[in-house]
């Protein structure tokens, strides 16, 4: 492999990596019809996943991927079928950003407009975008720097 080809493969790898941070504005719920193999009939349950669903509020970009609003995805296996569903975690920060169309609360790596003094004593908001757990009959979304958010 020559140096030029190696550089292209590294650049392509970065492009693929960055594609994972593209915003997903839509929420979905559907049966997965196409997959390889057979789902065992006795495989039942739901796999939950949580992560930032968007990297912007309106036209403003979050300064760090830790600040994007949580989006919980559920993949459910039941009776040999697979269902997918995703929803944004409707935290006060998410609702405020959506309503106003821009970043309204300080994050881990994102400051609100107005400079350092406007951000100095404001707490870091909780986007509930890191983990998800079924506990005590309730589904909760987590963020390392804040309280769980019940869904």
Question: Where in the sequence are the language-model features?
Answer:
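Beta-propeller domains
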Residues: 1-151
